[in-house]
Regions:
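A short coil-to-beta-strand element that immediately follows conserved catalytic motifs
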Residues: 75-84
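Catalytic core of non-heme Fe(II) oxygenases with the double-stranded beta-helix
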Residues: 88-145, 153-160, 165-172
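Secondary-structure boundary/capping residues
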Residues: 39, 77-78, 117
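Non-heme Fe(II)/2-oxoglutarate
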Residues: 1-74
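A short, polar/charged loop/turn motif at coil->beta-strand junctions and beta-hairpin connectors
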Residues: 9-12, 79, 156
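Short, solvent-exposed loop/turn elements at beta->coil junctions and helix N-caps
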Residues: 84-86, 149-150
């Protein structure tokens, strides 16, 4: 595994792509849960050009995601901090360069659906996700962003952000 030196001087492993995070039935179930609700049960955020929500239904998948995270991040003390569904569309869709700052030490960005790929950049390297793929990285330490939204007239991208932290960071 390659390691990247962060601006802080700390070394972190390169992000990891997980193909087919969920089996096909679970993936379809998640899509069918969110697609009908996008513009009715979700808040619109014009800063990112997205509809988003953090519904309790995502907790149903926490054990599955947590098992992957513990292996990838080599830690048995991880716990979910929060999950967020985001649907991007239109000319305002964007993700500026940032690091996370809200209990997002470990991040799994899961591509639920997309009209076409919209690469995520993590520490200056592009990662292309297919539907049902995820990229795992250190959200609070690795800069990440997306370039211009492709084909804003027709493009739609659904992502779920699974954020995790260490147990002792949550309770203290």
């Amino acid at each position: 595994m390659l390691h990247v030196r962060l601006a802080s001087g700390r070394m972190r492993p390169d992000p990891v792509i997980v193909n087919n995070l969920f089996d096909i039935n679970q993936h379809s179930e998640i899509i069918n849960t969110f697609l009908p609700l996008i513009k009715t049960d979700h808040v619109y955020d014009s800063n990112f050009g997205r509809y988003y929500s953090s519904p309790d239904i995502l907790n149903k998948y926490s054990d599955h995601v947590l098992a992957h995270a513990k292996k990838i991040f080599n830690s048995n003390t991880l716990v979910p901090s929060y999950f967020l569904f985001s649907h991007y569309e239109g000319k305002e869709a964007s993700l500026f360069k940032h690091i996370d700052d809200n209990a997002c030490t470990y991040t799994i960005d899961y591509c639920l659906y997309q009209s076409e790929p919209w690469d995520i950049f993590i520490e200056d390297k592009a990662y292309t996700l297919n539907e049902n793929d995820a990229v795992c990285f250190y959200g609070e330490e690795q800069f990440h962003w997306r370039e211009s939204f492709p084909n804003p007239e027709s493009q739609k991208v659904g992502m779920i952000f699974f954020h995790l932290n260490h147990f002792f960071n949550i309770v203290n």
